[in-house]
Amino acid sequence: MIMINYLVNRMDFQMASFITSGLLVIIGLYGVFFVDNVLKKIIALEILGSGVNLALIAIGYNGGTIPIKLPGVSVEVFAKESAYPLTHALVLTNIVIEASMLAVMLGVSIILYKKYKTLRSSVILKED
């Protein structure tokens, strides 16, 4: 426990976010490639997407303030101290795309279950 506290104190927010996003991506890839259930694969894809979103947020993190121009702050100081807004816009776009993909994947999984009476991908692939 002492070692974990030491690492947390020595690590900054951006590095912790990169490590967490890497772990989420690894967990998501493991679920996509090695899990047999279709619903669990969908959950793994969502975890993978969350890891990518967290990595994008960590890339845009600047350690400064939120990207809102306050009165009395020069443009140079504002640009130097604010977070990078493009990565945040990409994450918002990615969340919308992931939500629509989730709806389609769940719809396809319902159709697969009605046709094959199972959600195990090995059984579904053998029957085709």
From Swiss-Prot:
It holds the Pfam family Oxidored_q2. It is found in: Cell membrane. The keyword Signal does not apply. GO terms for cellular component: plasma membrane. Its main location: membrane. The keyword Nucleotide-binding does not apply. This is Uncharacterized protein MJ1310. PANTHER family: ANTIPORTER SUBUNIT MNHC2-RELATED. NCBIfam families: PRK07375.1-3. The chain crosses the membrane at residues 13-35, 42-64, 90-112. One of its GO terms (biological process) is sodium ion transmembrane transport. InterPro entries: CPA3_antiporter_subunitC (IPR050601), NUOK/Mnh_C1-like (IPR039428). GO terms for molecular function: sodium:proton antiporter activity. It is a multi-pass membrane protein. Keywords: Cell membrane, Membrane, Transmembrane, Transmembrane helix.
